[in-house]
Amino acid sequence: MSDIVVIGGGIAGLSAAARLSEHFSVTVLEREQATGYHASGRSAAMFEQNYGLPSTVALNKASAQYHREANGGYLSPRGLMIIAAREDAEAFDDDVVTMGIERISKDRAVELVPILDPAKFTFAGYHEAGYDIDTDRLMQDFIRQIR
């Protein structure tokens, strides 16, 4: 008999179950044959601390140190670039402000990502503090913690 049942074996469910397992008996129910089968296993696995709604940004900031340091860290530097067409200027400006992105020239954007066609975008921005998350290792560590 479990004290708590967590439904879903993706990153959110496994994370919650791992934390709860420190104090309770926890069972994770997953419909698929493997954990992380859907979005958690197929995502771009990007950690950008300032991305999302205010509630998401708060969670990102609260978890940043854990992702950097726990079990040797789960983050690898990648950087984040955004590009936008002229008609998306307002949304681009909002992202620059809320995410702390530095505006860069189209030439610099193409230098960083040579496949970009400068005729297809008007604005570009770059932020070094974007990271890849090793989601597989993170989920496996959560599973070990749950057991």
Specify the residue positions occupied by each region the protein language model found.
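Beta1/beta-strand and adjacent pyrophosphate-binding region of the FAD-binding site
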Residues: 1-12, 27
